[in-house]
Swiss-Prot record:
Family: Belongs to the bacterial ribosomal protein bL35 family.
Gene: rpmI
GO biological process, one term: translation
Disulfide bridges in this chain: none
Keyword Glycoprotein on entry: no
A Pfam family that the UniProt record links to this protein: Ribosomal_L35p
Transport is among the record's keywords: no
Entry GO CC: cytosolic large ribosomal subunit
Organism for this UniProt entry: Yersinia enterocolitica serotype O:8 / biotype 1B (strain NCTC 13174 / 8081)
Single GO MF descriptor: structural constituent of ribosome
Name of the protein in its database record: Large ribosomal subunit protein bL35
Entry-linked InterPro entries: Ribosomal_bL35, Ribosomal_bL35-like, Ribosomal_bL35_CS, Ribosomal_bL35_sf
Annotated keywords: Ribonucleoprotein, Ribosomal protein
């Protein structure tokens, strides 16, 4: 049986946690930052978790994670 290919874009975006979830970076922190409040940018800084609704898609993209 052939190996399953990992989606390389997903491998760069998600990291698996010990509990089986996936960490991800928040959106809206790349450009046009001057009009965004400091508090908003600060809250976007820490990693978020992939929601349970999207978990199946991420797992399918990362078969060996």
């Amino acid at each position: 049986m052939p190996k399953i290919k990992t989606v390389r874009g997903a491998a760069k975006r998600f990291k698996k946690t010990g509990a089986g979830g996936f960490k991800r970076k928040h959106a809206n922190l790349r450009h046009i930052l001057t009009k965004k409040a400091t508090k908003r940018k600060r809250h976007l800084r820490p990693k978020g978790m992939v929601s349970k609704n999207d978990l199946g898609l991420v797992v399918a993209c990362l078969p060996y994670a």
